[in-house]
Amino acid sequence: MGEYIVTKTLNNNVVVCTNNDQEVILIGKGIGFNKKEGMALNDQTITIEKIYKLESEQQKAHYKSLVEIADDNVLQVIIDSLNFISNTAMNVDSKQLVVSLTDHIIFAYKRLKQNQVISNPFVMETMQLYSDAYHIAKQVIDQLNAALDVHFPEDEIGFIALHIASNTEDLSMHEMTLINNVIKKGIDIIESDLVTTVDKESLQYQRFIRHVQFLIRRLRRKEYIHAQDDFVSMIKNHYPICYNTAYKILTMIQKQFDVNISESEIIYLTLHIHHFEERINQS
């Protein structure tokens, strides 16, 4: 790994160093204790848990400012969480996650201590769409609760799952939130048109949200599907209510993501909505 020259000690667990003219952040328990600017470090004399090379000056400045406002105990718990996530089977971009997750947990903890809880309306959608990330996020929250002697609400599992998933999916946090929002509004339309309450544990719900997720991805890549004309006519005639509902949902998606919607897309979404209708008729 070579030699690291300390340029700044952020706290007992984090130091900023240079290595071959590259500024890096070293993280490890007690790594910054009594370390002064100009001191030389190497992995023989200290235990380095993580090395981060933050690419942009904005990332570096933001991370440094975060570390400076967090106490050592909170930061160590965050470091442990990052290590835990990195050691899972998910292919996480640690350089991106270290900044976003540190930022999120520091301020979520501060809000919790001040009894300010932000609700997450997309917990169920996140759980279904990104189940692996959600499972890991739940374990992270359990660790945070135990280490910090607090009780983060389930909303936070959803938020952290999105941070994790955005580092493994080809979507940004913003895009993932938009998709969750579209799915939630779509379910609202279905519940209104079919006069029902959708069971969010049902197979129909899981299939619907998966379909919408991949539908949006395809449309953004300009990948379109085509159904035969006679099939389109048959579905429109057989399931007019479901077709009308699908049309409303896809019109919303069209406006939200500025994409083109074909008649075939409406037909295939109609079939998914019909599954909800069938479930209602069976109950």
From Swiss-Prot:
A biological process from GO: positive regulation of DNA-templated transcription
Pfam families named among the record's database cross-references: CAT_RBD, PRD
Organism: Staphylococcus aureus (strain NCTC 8325 / PS 47)
Cited SUPFAM superfamilies: PTS-regulatory domain, PRD, SacY-like RNA-binding domain
GO molecular function, one term: RNA binding
Disulphides: none
Stored InterPro entries: BglG_antiterminators (IPR050661), CAT_RNA-bd_dom (IPR004341), CAT_RNA-bd_dom_sf (IPR036650), PRD (IPR011608), PRD_sf (IPR036634), Transcrpt_antitermin_CS (IPR001550)
Keyword list, A-Z: Repeat
Family to which the UniProt record says this protein belongs: Belongs to the transcriptional antiterminator BglG family. GlcT subfamily.
This protein's name: Protein GlcT
Domain PRD span(s) in chain numbering: 69-173, 174-283
